[in-house]
C-alpha cells in the first residue's frame, strides 16, 4: 500500500514522502496514529494544499522538543526503592517510574519516551537512560536509585 507520510517516521521517511509499506503496517499503525494517509489522488491534492501548515506544525514540534531537551539534558532523577543489603531491588525501576518522577519535577515526559537500553533498573546506584523527545531529539538523564533498607 502506498501512503503519504504526514510526519517524520523513523526508518521510513519524512513529511510528504510517498512510500510503499505493508498493508498491515499502514492499517494498524501509520494511519490510526495520524502519521500517514493512503496515497490516493484526492489525498495527494489535499496534502499539497495543507503542506505549508503541516511543515510549520512539524517545525514547532521540533522546536518545542529541542527547548525541553536543553532543560532536561543532564538532569539527575532520584528514586528510592526497597532493596536488600546486597544492593538488589525488590522489584525494579521502570520507564513509567522515571517518567512519573520527571513529570513531578516539571518536565512533560511520557513513559513511552523513556528508553531503558538495558531493561529495567534492578540494582541500587546510578544509571543513564535516554529520553527520546522527538525523532531528532534525544537526551540522556541520570537516574540515581537509593535503597530503602527499612
Swiss-Prot record:
GO terms for molecular function: rRNA binding; structural constituent of ribosome. The keyword Ribonucleoprotein applies. The keyword Transcription regulation does not apply. Pfam families: Ribosomal_L9_C, Ribosomal_L9_N. One of its GO terms (biological process) is translation. PROSITE patterns: RIBOSOMAL_L9. Transmembrane segments: none annotated. GO terms for cellular component: ribonucleoprotein complex; ribosome. Disulfide bonds: none annotated. Keywords: Ribonucleoprotein, Ribosomal protein, RNA-binding, rRNA-binding. Gene3D superfamilies: Ribosomal protein L9, C-terminal domain (3.10.430.100), Ribosomal protein L9, N-terminal domain (3.40.5.10). Belongs to the bacterial ribosomal protein bL9 family. Binds to the 23S rRNA. This is Large ribosomal subunit protein bL9.
Amino acid at each position: 500500500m502506498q501512503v503519504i507520510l504526514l510526519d517524520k517516521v523513523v526508518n521510513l521517511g519524512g513529511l510528504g514522502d510517498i512510500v510503499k509499506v505493508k498493508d498491515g503496517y499502514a492499517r494498524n499503525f501509520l494511519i490510526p496514529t495520524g502519521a500517514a494517509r493512503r496515497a490516493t489522488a484526492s489525498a495527494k491534492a489535499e496534502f499539497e494544499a495543507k503542506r505549508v501548515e503541516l511543515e510549520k506544525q512539524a517545525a514547532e514540534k521540533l522546536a518545542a522538543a529541542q527547548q525541553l531537551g536543553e532543560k532536561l539534558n543532564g538532569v539527575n532523577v532520584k528514586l528510592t526503592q526497597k532493596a536488600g543489603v546486597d544492593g538488589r531491588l525488590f522489584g525494579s525501576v521502570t520507564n513509567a517510574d522515571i517518567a512519573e518522577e520527571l513529570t513531578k519535577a516539571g518536565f512533560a515526559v511520557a513513559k513511552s519516551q523513556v528508553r531503558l537500553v538495558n531493561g529495567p533498573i534492578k540494582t541500587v546506584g546510578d544509571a543513564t537512560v535516554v529520553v527520546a523527545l522527538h525523532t531528532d531529539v534525544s537526551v540522556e538523564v541520570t537516574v540515581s536509585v537509593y535503597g530503602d533498607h527499612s
